[in-house]
Structure formats: structure tokens, C-alpha cells
Amino acid sequence: MQICVFFCTFAAVFCVLWFKRRHSKQTMIDNQLIFRSFASGSSGNCYFLGTSNWGILIDAGISARTIQRNLREMGLDYANIMGVLVTHDHADHIRAVGTLGERVHLPIYSTRDIHNGIDRNYGVREKLRTSQRYFEKGIEWELNGMKINTFGVSHDSTECVGYVIDFMGQRILIVTDCGQPNATMEMYLSTANHVIIEANHDEGMLLNGPYPTYLKERILSPKGHQSNVTCGELLARNWHTEMRNVFLCHLSHENNEPEVALNTIKDILLDEGIMPGEDVFVTPLERIKPSPVYVLNDQIIKP
């Protein structure tokens, strides 16, 4: 009998302590802004930004099933998603928007020109009929407390936009595809706390690689993709003491490697006296494998 009482008491105490620890940890996470990349690259792009209770998706260039699996790993589902923000109408960014918009009934946000491009894209089998939501570049709007600004980005799509999202005291800049930086992009970069930015290719790998000439020229053009060097110089030029974390996105499988991108950008920052890991956290996002869940706050992420 005494043994039974002991184990029952021990179990009760353990359950109380476990609940308190879990509740305390969950409350801490609930009060934080979190970011996770589900995929980042020419084979598909999709990012989550929000809290442990709800969030938004930026682009949906992977299957709806894969997106849902990643959400469920975070304890979320489509019911917790307030909408999808689309950067442009290339297939690797919009593969699942038809399914998410018309079957899951998520609002799909973008400019009218981008929505027209989505409608013409044969890769989107389920056409958007009722889920389109339009915004105009340069006009701030709000989604569940997130203040969202958009600006034009140079890329060879129907239209391409970058996003600036202010939420929970943090400013997040998202530029996934960019052939040439512009003044508006640099203005927002100089005030952003957290940056998701393209580092698509190493120029030497591209020029010496197997791509045909026309494709190399397209990538290197002002409406193509941003190189590691351009990305590094852009960050160094606009770094400020409130910039905390930089996530390198849309790395090419054929013309880049995560270590190459990271080392190139770190070297450029170091040349300008900016210490990666101390002054700013920089990490490449993987093409297919989802990233860890990152908490975005006033602290620099420590690997």
C-alpha cells in the first residue's frame, strides 16, 4: 500500500511539474514571432511567419500536402493560416496557390498583375476564382495585426514584389528573386531587423557551369537573379546595429552551395568590419529540407 501511495504521489508531482514547464515554455513561444522556411530554391519556395497559434505563408511553390505536413510538425494546420502572400507568378512560387485558395479557402494576396500572371500560368491547374485578394504596391495594409508594405523588385515575371512586415516590434524584409537592387529595397533593408534575401548563385560557378548561354545571360541580367557577391555587398552597404538575422534564400542547386554563399557573404561583411555571429547572424536556407523554427526578436540567433 505504501509503495502504491508513493508511486501515485510521484506520478502526480511529475505531471504537475511537466504541465507547468510545458505551459511556461508554450506561453513564452506564444509571445514570440517565429519564422520557418519549408523550401527555398528553384524547385519550390514557401515560408511561414507568425506565432505558435497562427501565421501567414509567403509563396506556395511546393505541394499543398508538403506544406500541411510542415505546418503539422509545428502544431499548426491550414485553419491557423490567415493567408498566402505571393511574390510573383513563376511556378516555383505558386504551385499550390490554386489548391490553397479554392480547396482550402485561404485568401491569396498579391497585385492585380501578379494575379493575372497566375491565371495564365499552366502550372496552376486549379484556377483562382474566389480567393484572390488584391493590394497595391506602396500602400500599407494590415493582416491580423501585421502591417504589410510592398515594393517592386526587378525580375522577369509578370510583376515581382518584395514584402516588408512589421509585427511584434520587429521588421522583416523578404526579397526572394531580384536581378538588380533598387533604392526602395535598400531603404527597407537599412531599417529591417530580420532579412530573407536571395543569394542565388556564385558567378564563377554559373559562368563555368553547364547552363546554355541564353540561360546564363538571363540569370546575370538586371531581371535575373542576385549573386552571392551582390547580396553580400548589399548587406554590407545597408547593415545597421538593429539588423539581427539574415536568411539567404533561393540558392541555385547547380550554381551555388550553401557553404560558398555563406563564406562569400561573411568575407564581404568582415571586410567592412561587420562580424558575422556577433553583429549579425547569417545562415543559408536549404532548398528542400525545412529549416528549424527560428524565433525573431531583439537577439541575434546563436547557432
Roles of regions detected by a PLM:
Residues 9, 17, 25-74, 159-177, ...:
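Conserved beta-strand hairpin/beta-sheet module of binuclear metal-dependent hydrolase folds
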Residues 58-61, 82-89, 110-112, 173-176, ...:
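Active-site neighborhood of phospho(di)ester-bond hydrolases with catalytic His/Asp-centered motifs
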Residues 65-111:
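Active-site metal-binding motif and surrounding structural segment of the metallo-beta-lactamase
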Residues 90-94, 116-117, 158, 181-183, ...:
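Active-site environment of divalent metal-dependent phosphoester hydrolases
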Residues 95-104, 120-121, 256-263:
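Metal-dependent catalytic neighborhoods of phosphoester/phosphodiester hydrolases
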Residues 112-162, 166-169:
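Metallo-beta-lactamase
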Residues 183-283:
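Cap/insert and terminal regions of metallo-dependent hydrolase folds
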Residues 281-303:
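Short, basic/aromatic-enriched C-terminal tail that caps enzymatic domains
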